[in-house]
């Protein structure tokens, strides 16, 4: 997949971070900052999903929010996915009660 569209979208964000943001007082209530979040979201998730995540974050960042640590979510395809497995399938360990039932105790 080409990274050119992602880089084209991230370029204005980097310009803002380098030239405009240093002239403004710190205002973002989140870590990472909204501009860093937007750049990371686009690079991680692609242009469309990344911009949607960035817009959602900007709508949450206002004077009445608590703020705090809010990282970019991991890509949907990350993890221990098995080809052909359903997206909602999760592995789990048997409980002690299930083990005792299966062993006839």
UniProtKB/Swiss-Prot annotation:
Q: Where in the cell is it found?
A: Cell inner membrane
The answer to whether UniProt assigns keyword Signal to this entry is no
Pfam families found in the cross-reference section? YidD
Keywords carried by this UniProt record: Cell inner membrane, Cell membrane, Membrane
Q: Which domain of life is it from?
A: Bacteria
Q: Note the InterPro entries from the entry.
A: Membr_insert_effic_factor_YidD (IPR002696)
Main subcellular location: membrane
A GO cellular component annotation here is:
plasma membrane
Regarding the membrane, this protein is recorded as: Peripheral membrane protein
Mind telling me which SMART domains this protein's record contains? Haemolytic (SM01234)
Spell out the HAMAP family in the cross-references.
UPF0161_YidD
Family, as annotated: Belongs to the UPF0161 family.
Q: Which PANTHER family match?
A: MEMBRANE PROTEIN INSERTION EFFICIENCY FACTOR-RELATED
The task this protein performs is described as:
Could be involved in insertion of integral membrane proteins into the membrane.
Q: What is this protein called?
A: Putative membrane protein insertion efficiency factor
- Organism of origin is Nitratidesulfovibrio vulgaris (strain DSM 19637 / Miyazaki F) (Desulfovibrio vulgaris)
The top of its lineage is:
Bacteria, Pseudomonadati, Thermodesulfobacteriota, Desulfovibrionia, Desulfovibrionales
